[in-house]
Amino acid sequence: MAKKQHIYLGLLVIFMMVLTMFAWQMTANAWPSNEELTFLKAFLYYQSYIMPFFLALVIWGFKHKQVSKSFMLIAVIGCSLGIYARFIEPNLLLVKETTIKTGYSLKIALISDMHYGLYSTPWQMQRLVNKLNTLEVDMVLVAGDWTYEPAKNSSLTEQLAPFKQLKHPIYSVPGNHDEEMPGPPLAKELKQALIDNHIHPIEAKTVDLGKVRLVGLADLLPLATKEIRLNALKQQDKPLLLLTHNPESLEYLPKLTQPFVMLAGHTHGGQVNLPILTEKILHLLTEQGYKRGMYALDNNNQLFITSGIGMVGLPLRFAMPPTIDILRFE
């Protein structure tokens, strides 16, 4: 019995070493802002594959009276939740519909925070494009954060190529990870990659949609360019649809004479959505504690935050699955 146990433990150690080599390879291929931190994230990403094997080892130990029942139960619950949050929920893709009262008719798909790079796969990108193509919408809006330390051995144009298949018009603003806050210096290359793949960057620009004007505000965090970005708000002849990344951009808005709906991402809905704890953390990180969904503002203005698609920090999503938000304005 002891000999078998030593063999299993030895195989587990070898498996961990192989996973560490994969983490080194991921780090070498990434376009990192901090190599040590990137390796740590890659290490966590790959070492998470141990969970199913660790769980099997604990159950085997319990059956052979090497592990107590209480330890086994804790391991089963912990590993089951971890396996779900690491391998199952991040690979879901929900579509949610929300109606917004505005007085004009428009139907859009809102996505954000895809974070293509460390924790994503080409399959997930292709699936997102395929799903968007099945939706009956007027356009797709992207509220920033396309990247998360993407691969440096191929161009961003090549990596984002599936979006060229999209049948809807698509407009985008960058997020903080697209503008070195944090992240590698890829803003210029990303903008060109979007254009090459028929995606319209509208940062500091407007798009006339008939009865409403779409305004691209991006993140507004780089204060040096704040005035340039806000110039797009000077034309106020009709209701405004403001596309930004961080909902805290509300704090930078000048007084607007037209009603507006602001669309944002950034929060991931907390990404790991734990009762009470996630709300407390969000309130510590931001003044308003924004999470996801609809928020009523002064003067009948409105804010909608999408929970996004990808992951940052930990390669986990829990009780906050990747979501495409369909917004029906009427």
Residue ranges and their predicted role:
Residues 1-90:
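Non-catalytic terminal accessory segments
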Residues 80-102, 118-123:
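Hydrophobic alpha-helical transmembrane segments in integral membrane proteins
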Residues 104-110, 115-330:
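Soluble catalytic domains of enzymes that build or remodel membrane lipids, polysaccharides, and related
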